[in-house]
Amino acid sequence: MKPNISLINAVFRIACGLTIMSAASAKFTKKPWCRMHLFYIFMGAMKAGSGILRFCPVTYMFQHSDSGNNEHQNG
């Protein structure tokens, strides 16, 4: 698994992911019965994790789907 996002993009993802996680955690402590805050915590963790690993599965999928379409058009 090699990195497919830039360093600046990774730093931005880490910052946004940790911000989302901390805001959702604060809301979740006030309303633990609301499951939407738990969903936001997981989404923030996923965003921060993709920044730490510098690998985004969605970017990978789009890069490989574009290369497959070019082969069909050329061949």
Curated annotation (Swiss-Prot):
Membrane topology term reads: Multi-pass membrane protein
**The name this protein goes by in its record:** Uncharacterized membrane protein YezF
**Keywords tagged on the record:** Cell membrane, Membrane, Transmembrane, Transmembrane helix
Localization annotation: Cell membrane
Which parts of the chain span the membrane according to its record?
Answer: 7-26, 36-58
One Pfam family name is YgaP-like_TM
The UniProt record lists the keyword Phosphoprotein: no
Taxonomic superkingdom: Bacteria
Main location per UniProt?
A: membrane
Q: Which organism is it from?
A: Bacillus subtilis (strain 168)
For this UniProt entry, what's an example GO CC term?
A: plasma membrane
Q: Which InterPro entries match?
A: YgaP-like_TM
